Regions:
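Pyridoxal 5′-phosphate
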Residues: 1-215
Length: 215
């Protein structure tokens, strides 16, 4: 579709991992396609950050944003994350919603009339981050640093493969169960999520899980 629209496109904005199906998209291929038609490419990584390995700089993604309260465990209301490729951070003419926390740190408190952006993704910050929320987020990031995304990804693949096996075993064990996993079977095309169609069994299944204390 990107090639079909061609130079009609200015920006390609896409979800890196679909929240409904659990499908992980090939962000590198999407970025390359967008750049070939002259578009900037960005991603909503709300369901990908902390879930799958991301190489935004190497893929030459122009920008991305994500929340941290899901897989990154910073709790509801946790600070958001932002990526801007280094190719763009020195462009002071680039339009942005500018705030004082994105101003050159050396001159921030001089209260000058002109905005002087930091030459990094920091220049897109509007105000200072909430300290207590950042403390919770930092505790989670420390664990990620200690374990590493490669190890997390390997564990994720093992767990989802086992869950996929169990769901299929349960579905095939009785004529009264018919569960369909709509998340891609290829581990490289999904994250930690398996989405299931219950085919008419949703309410009974919901009631059973609720009775057992499953949220």
């Amino acid at each position: 579709k990107i090639y079909e629209l061609g130079d009609e496109l200015a920006v390609v904005m896409f979800g890196g991992l679909n929240y409904y199906t659990g499908q992980l998209f090939d962000m590198q291929a999407i970025t390359e396609a967008g750049h070939k038609v002259g578009a900037k490419v960005g991603f909503d990584l709300a369901h990908a950050a902390g879930n799958v390995e991301l190489f935004l700089h190497d893929w030459k993604v122009d920008f991305a944003a994500w929340c941290t309260y899901k897989y990154m465990n910073s709790s509801p209301g946790g600070v958001a994350g932002l990526f801007v490729h280094e190719n763009h951070v020195s462009n002071e003419e680039l339009l942005r919603l500018a705030g004082w926390w994105g101003h050159d740190k050396e001159r921030r408190f001089l209260m000058e009339p002109q905005f002087k952006p930091i030459h990094s993704a920091e220049s897109w910050q509007l105000s200072n981050a909430p300290v207590l929320g950042m403390a919770a987020h930092l505790a989670s990031l420390d664990i990620y640093d200690e374990v590493g995304m490669s190890a997390i990804s390997k564990k994720r693949e093992d767990l989802t493969a086992y869950l996929e096996f169990v769901i299929n075993e349960v579905s095939n064990s009785s004529a009264h169960t018919n569960f369909e996993i709509i998340t891609p079977k290829n581990p490289k095309e999904r994250g930690s999520q398996l989405s299931i169609l219950a085919h008419g069994q949703l309410k009974p299944l919901f009631d059973i899980l609720t009775k057992e204390g499953v949220i």
